[in-house]
């Protein structure tokens, strides 16, 4: 085991981008079963999920959760085992369109090629707040932070108008929509083609 400061590396928590030839090197067979059909997980046109941008939180019951993903594949979460910091293999999730997935867990937001990444959860006054970055990280990409809230850590998350954080279809430039409470945005000042300022 490799020690990183006061942390100890134990192993990967979730995988993405694997193929049929290397899936045995992941924990997918352990989660789904040795003979599970993994076709949807090896197709970028199906799930398109990236295992990036983790955020770990503990709920009021003492359960530990991790959110992650994904820009175009949606933001997801599943329960962790607090003794190992890895996935809680005793927790299972049904595969239901736009709600949950047997491997990736509970869907929190985004999906269908719409931007949405960097999920972060904050608990305050009885609500869980989901913060997510929309847009593209470039001068004209409209990179910004949107916020949704829920009474339950697993959602559903919605904005003040009742719009859900979960995308059920491709929207296009969803960062130009009015879904989610916009907190911060990128701007482009005329006469300055090289800067990006977040306000």
Which role does the model predict for each range below?
Residues 1, 5-197:
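Carbohydrate-active catalytic/glycan-binding domains of CAZyme proteins
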